Amino acid sequence: MSDPVMDAYTQAYNSSGNMVQAFGVISESGQVLWQSNNWDLTADASTLMSAVKSRASSVIQNQVKYSTMRSTPESLVARNVQGSGILILTKIDTTSDRWVVAWADAQAQPDGVYVDVDRAAKTLRGKI
């Protein structure tokens, strides 16, 4: 039996041209439900959710500051101005409290990589 989150991560990685390089699922309460083994969301999950809810102008993940480029009630896209990548949060579905958090290479196009992550997130409806 395959892991639906790993499948979603693989989909985002492939569709983004290998730009999505870290992936996780968190709850609105800040609980980490799944994360790729190349990063740790536990210290920042609650802060990330607070940033989305408050539409913060910046967010910190793993001691790296990202400036918010776009924020809606269901998503946040932020870029590190020093070139440390792009952070994307997107809600799995409107009735769930589950969110995908992804990190993409600094060379990625923010809008394009957001679409790739959002599509992958939507495949997780009812699965996590």
Curated annotation (Swiss-Prot):
GO cellular component, one term: cytoplasm
Classification via Pfam families: Profilin
Record flagged with keyword Cytoplasm: yes
Keywords: Cytoplasm, Cytoskeleton
Location of the protein in the cell: Cytoplasm, Cytoskeleton
Molecular function per GO: actin binding
Major localization class: cytoplasm
Top-level taxon: Archaea
InterPro entries recorded: PFN, PFN_sf
Family: Belongs to the Asgard profilin family.
Function: Has no profilin activity against rabbit actin.
Protein name: Thor profilin
